């Protein structure tokens, strides 16, 4: 019966809701998931998360594009950038988060383009356009008030999308955009050349966020991209915010990063004629439930797993896996050697403690949260 249902889903050409029970949807943010068709030689469905304020709209629309994790894109989780979602919902936006072809439950295969980074971005932007074509046909969408945002590979996709000059898209926001390709000769120079090429065809302004301890793109890499983009006529304001935590690449997903990007983004939105100020009537969307984040301690460096108390080799190996998970995240330990971690919303702190306490005899405590250690010795 399940096989038949899946076949029917593939045959359907309309955007199809997925069952909430399968996805742990956040009802407080009106979260839903659709499979949106992308028409071509073959129709493929793109897994897309939608968050909307209550009411009929029309709402301004923001697309948030995801990055690319290490490994097979099919095993990448559905992207849920809830910090950004809350920011935009409070300002009355409908938030659309598409998973591109070959990622998570989206159909098709990831098309990398080899070392042709310019082509890579253009292919990714094609998937985003298919989703936006669907969105702009909905009565709740304000087709004249739209914004494109992206993080990491999604930031690169956002810059590539700018070349389409899609009607109603007023601006682009790029958080640490690019794609690191160590296997390609002079890949940093390739990024800069492609950025300049995108700029020549882009008519809308953009806002860029990059830090100086980014594990993917060093300072000279992002400065070269920005120089090439603006040198080719692109409108791009660079917010170079210096160092952030142990890896500035995580700024957009980290709670501590909000104070860096939110004020800058609010000013930028107002400058391009988009809603920038939070509305008091929508304040409920800004409330974050769950455990409070403990204060950072100086017990140990974040990446020094040798200092973690109690755990054995398996726990230290688990901690290494934890450090590769996206923020928000948390890692918990217990005196008997039990450990557990969780990443993503909702409330990774509580979920990491729950995972640890399956064997921790209710004695688990948090060792690390997000990008820092919170452990205190008794």
Q: Regions from the language model: what does each represent?
A:
Residues 140-151:
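Alpha/beta-hydrolase fold nucleophile elbow
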Residues 103, 279-378:
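Secreted/extracellular ectodomain signature
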Residues 69-81, 87, 97-123:
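Cap/lid segment of the alpha/beta-hydrolase catalytic domain
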Residues 171, 177-237:
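The feature captures the conserved acid-bearing segment of alpha/beta-hydrolase catalytic domains
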Residues 58-67:
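Short beta-strand element of the alpha/beta-hydrolase
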Residues 21-56:
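N-terminal cap/lid segment of alpha/beta-hydrolase-fold proteins
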Residues 116-139:
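Alpha/beta-hydrolase active-site loop
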Residues 232-290:
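C-terminal catalytic histidine-bearing segment of alpha/beta-hydrolase fold enzymes
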């Amino acid at each position: 019966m399940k096989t038949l249902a899946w076949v029917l889903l593939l045959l359907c050409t309309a955007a199809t809701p997925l069952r909430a029970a399968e996805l742990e949807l956040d009802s407080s943010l009106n979260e839903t998931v659709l499979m949106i068709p992308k028409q071509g030689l073959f129709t493929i469905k793109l897994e897309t998360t939608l968050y909307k304020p209550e009411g009929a709209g029309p709402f301004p629309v923001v697309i948030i594009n995801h990055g690319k994790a290490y490994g097979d894109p099919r095993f990448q989780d559905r992207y849920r950038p809830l910090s950004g979602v809350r920011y935009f919902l409070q300002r009355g936006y409908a938030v659309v988060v598409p998973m591109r072809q070959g990622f998570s439950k989206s159909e098709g295969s990831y098309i990398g383009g080899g070392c042709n980074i310019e082509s890579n971005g253009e292919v990714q932007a094609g998937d985003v356009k298919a989703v936006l074509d669907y969105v702009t046909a909905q009565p709740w969408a304000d087709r004249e008030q739209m914004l494109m945002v992206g993080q990491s590979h999604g930031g690169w996709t956002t810059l590539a999308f700018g070349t389409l000059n899609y009607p109603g898209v007023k601006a682009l926001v790029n958080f640490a955009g690019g794609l690191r390709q160590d296997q390609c000769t002079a890949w940093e120079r390739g990024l800069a050349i492609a950025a300049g090429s995108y700029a020549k065809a882009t008519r809308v302004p953009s806002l860029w966020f990059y830090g100086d301890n980014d594990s993917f793109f060093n300072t000279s890499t992002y400065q070269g991209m920005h120089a090439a983009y603006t040198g080719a006529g692109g409108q791009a304001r660079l917010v170079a915010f210096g160092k952030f935590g142990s890896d500035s690449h995580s700024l957009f997903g980290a709670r501590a990063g909000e104070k860096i990007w939110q004020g800058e983004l609010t000013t930028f939105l107002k400058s391009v004629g988009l809603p920038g100020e939070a509305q008091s009537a929508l304040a409920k969307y800004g409330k974050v439930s769950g455990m409070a984040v403990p204060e950072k301690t100086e017990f140990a460096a974040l990446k020094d797993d040798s200092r973690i108390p109690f755990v054995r080799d398996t726990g230290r190996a688990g901690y290494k896996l934890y450090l590769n998970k996206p923020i928000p995240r948390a890692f918990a330990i217990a005196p008997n050697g039990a450990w557990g971690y969780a990443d993503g919303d909702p409330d990774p702190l509580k979920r990491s403690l729950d995972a640890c306490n399956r064997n921790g005899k209710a004695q688990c405590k948090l060792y690390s949260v997000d990008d820092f250690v919170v452990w205190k010795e008794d």
